[in-house]
Amino acid sequence: MPSMFYRFVVLVLALTAWSFADTKKPASKPAGGAPDKAHLQKIWDGWGTLDPSNVAEYYATGPHTFFDIAPLKYASWDEYKAGVVKELADYKAAKFTVNDDAEIHPAGQYAWVTATVKEDMTQKSGKREMGNFRWTAVFEKQNGRWVIVHEHVSAPMQ
């Protein structure tokens, strides 16, 4: 009987050691990936050119709602692009930086992100505007690319 007990103890110890040795870290990204902070920064680098055509590839076409600081809303990328050109017409330079508080929440073929974005903009008159604003975006994977299907940009009331 002692040899049976000895075998049992050895078996339990071996299984325990094997279970600890076979631990693997879970993948840091879900299958299919999600936009990452570098991707988010590319979008804002495009906006820094003050030319919406430089960010068009990041936005879905069709009837989607985009909320920017002004006006109240846009119902499609075409409306957004046309409206933003007017809003940016008074500026000669801009730089946007996605802050370290960016959060990316993957959910299958969708992902939603939140971040604050640092702005440094110079008007054609020379007046400089600096601050931070809030950004929330919903991405959808379309044809292998992550595109924004809903966006909200806002500044805190002062």
Predicted regions and their residues:
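Bacterial N-terminal signal peptides
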Residues: 7-17
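Short, low-complexity N-terminal intrinsically disordered segments enriched in polar/charged residues
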Residues: 20-61
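Short beta-strand segments enriched in hydrophobic/aromatic residues
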Residues: 59-60, 117-119, 152-155
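A short hydrophobic beta-strand element
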Residues: 108-119
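A solvent-exposed, acidic/Ser-Thr-rich amphipathic alpha-helical stretch
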Residues: 34, 52-107, 129-130
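Beta-strand elements of well-folded, non-transmembrane domains
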Residues: 119-123, 139
